[in-house]
Amino acid sequence: MKNQIVYEFPLNERMRLFMRLEQLFRQARHFNQGGSVWDCRAVVATLNEIVALLARNDIKSELLKELDRLGGGLGKMQGNQHIDQAALATVLGQIDAAAQRIYGHSGRIGYQVMENELFKSVAQRTAIPGGTCSFDLPGYHFWLERDVERRRNEATEWLDCFHPVQEGIALILGLLRDSAAGIWETAHGGFFQKNLDHAAAVQLLRVAVPIELPYFAEISGSKHRFTVRFLTGLSNERPVQCSEDVPFQLTVCLL
């Protein structure tokens, strides 16, 4: 059982994009393990969100820029006697391999899904509340009612179209989250503020709160400074900032 709740806050648009996609990929993979029609509907709905997000962003360019930045920064550590060179070589190899897989992907990532007639018919109806009923999309209804394994295999093929993106994002965010150790801080009266070195490449803030505390963290900020407020309130009440001192673990992630 976990003993902390972790709140994350990206400090630039690229990291926001990566974290949104990370959540959607996890969500889709989770529901694809289920066998019910409702699980499959959730997979398709999540895939539609992924496609919509990718349509507004050049994900190949964003991933390659970030992988190149990480590779360049970590490459400067080669030969440093204070760095585990074997581990560094492994990470640099992973970065290069992820970049090569994205470079080697011809055309738009996920175009096989975007051009699928069944998927397009569903996507066109998702803006309408309840717009994917059987009387709206009988072909979709037929597909959902077929053999579970066949349906799941097709959904898996769709998800796998985005594998280079999912893999690249997982590598980048994994390295970023592991780039620093957490430090215990105290939010006096439920409030904490700290300046950041704008010359440093701070990409992500992580706030870990003991799970037994009755507060949640609200993070806001920019590359110059950030604020953490601890709020309390039930689901049917407007949250208010607590007046107690709150201990939490802060991780400032940068590479």
From Swiss-Prot:
* Family, similarity comment: Belongs to the ZapD family.
Q: Does the keyword Transferase apply?
A: no
Indicate the quaternary assembly. Answer: Interacts with FtsZ.
* Name of the protein described by the UniProt record: Cell division protein ZapD
* A GO cellular-component term linked to this record: cytoplasm
Main role? Cell division factor that enhances FtsZ-ring assembly. Directly interacts with FtsZ and promotes bundling of FtsZ protofilaments, with a reduction in FtsZ GTPase activity.
Recorded coiled-coil stretches:
none
Q: Which HAMAP family match?
A: ZapD (MF_01092)
InterPro entries, per database record: ZapD, ZapD_C, ZapD_sf
- Note whether Cytoplasm occurs among the keywords: yes
Q: Which cell locations does it reside in?
A: Cytoplasm
Instruction: Report keywords, A-Z.
Output: Cell cycle, Cell division, Cytoplasm, Septation
| Pfam families per UniProt | ZapD
Species name for this entry? Methylococcus capsulatus (strain ATCC 33009 / NCIMB 11132 / Bath)
Q: A Gene Ontology biological process annotation?
A: division septum assembly
